[in-house]
Swiss-Prot record:
Keyword terms of this UniProt record: ATP-binding, Cytoplasm, Magnesium, Metal-binding, Nucleotide-binding, One-carbon metabolism, Potassium, Transferase
Residue numbers binding L-methionine: 57, 100, 251, 282
Its biological purpose: Catalyzes the formation of S-adenosylmethionine (AdoMet) from methionine and ATP. The overall synthetic reaction is composed of two sequential steps, AdoMet formation and the subsequent tripolyphosphate hydrolysis which occurs prior to release of AdoMet from the enzyme.
GO CC list: cytoplasm
Protein's recorded name: S-adenosylmethionine synthase
SUPFAM superfamilies in the record: S-adenosylmethionine synthetase (SSF55973)
Entry binding sites for Mg(2+): 18
Taxonomic placement: Bacteria, Bacillati, Bacillota, Bacilli, Lactobacillales
The protein's assembly and partners: Homotetramer; dimer of dimers.
An annotated GO BP: S-adenosylmethionine biosynthetic process
Amino acid sequence: MSERKLFTSESVSEGHPDKIADQISDAILDAILAEDPDAHVAAETAVYTGSVHVFGEVSTTAYVDINRVVRDTIAEIGYNNAEYGFAAESVGVHPSLIEQSPDIAQGVNESLEVRGTGDQDSLDLIGAGDQGLMFGFAIDETPEFMPLPVSLSHKLVKKLADLRKSGEISYLRPDAKSQVTVEYDENDQPVRVDTVVISTQHDPEATNDQIRQDVIEKVIKAVIPAEYLDEDTKFFINPTGRFVIGGPQGDSGLTGRKIIVDTYGGYSRHGGGAFSGKDATKVDRSASYAARYIAKNIVAAGLAKKAEVQLAYAIGVANPVSVRVDTFGTATVAERKLESAVRDLFDLRPAGIIQMLDLKRPIYRQTAAYGHMGRTDVDLPWEKLDKVDALKAAVEA
């Protein structure tokens, strides 16, 4: 009998405290970019019972009503009832955004390449907003080229939110978490779902039996393909027995604490940088998107079954200090050819990434819940497959 291998990933709903913080940070970023596409923004948010603190650094000509953006975001998520201990129109909002450090700004606004040579290549002008390493990943086990465990985890909490907002399950509250364990065969192909864990906040009147039945029938079976479920699949639904107190009343939340949920569910490596609240000069965000774009096009081109792209930068320097492609032995061509093709086809300077993916637009709030990668419900430029033919041609040359 072949060895059984399990892999687990999780997701959280838009009403989870950390995701509330992410969405507020990205809503502020979008509001600023809508007025000033060249703004530099690093907006952090902390939420807890009855209170929201927004802090960080900005450089912009825009005026944004932070108080209104915060309240509108909370309302859209679904915190409109004082019984939740956190409601859009009654929370205290405490903004404290200051001007970006001139020491950082000088390296971002004029890269080392420009300062050193005096050349005026417009794509050399912007230096990386910080040092760091970023990863992008793709795999052929789902139509969206994402690992199955995190893909299913996102879809489960998104389905819970849809049922809550439509009123079909009226007792649901905004906070929820999911976790999916997938069994893989000896060829690393997913064959079944071993375990599903869902914890969902609810009104006090809802019974455990009712919650379990609704979640299994209306959420799990509606999301997970029947061929992955069998009589041995285990369901843990609200395993603590009660989840009435949730959201910021139950736990404080901070921007950037769900970086594995935001990416690949632990299936791929992560450089450690968070995304939300950061404009595209911050390579933590933009280079992670570029790396995903590259990896997805490599796999979609049939050049590998899975691909991980690492990029690394020095603060104030436009060109990446390293580019690496790892296909884990699944490539149909030499990895050095893939790396050469990537360098030729993708401009990985910050300004090049911004131009390539059109990242000065207010598109970020929609990424701040249910994953930044592999989304099929929203149109994100790093998910496009417009480099497939060019990659094929480049490796054949």
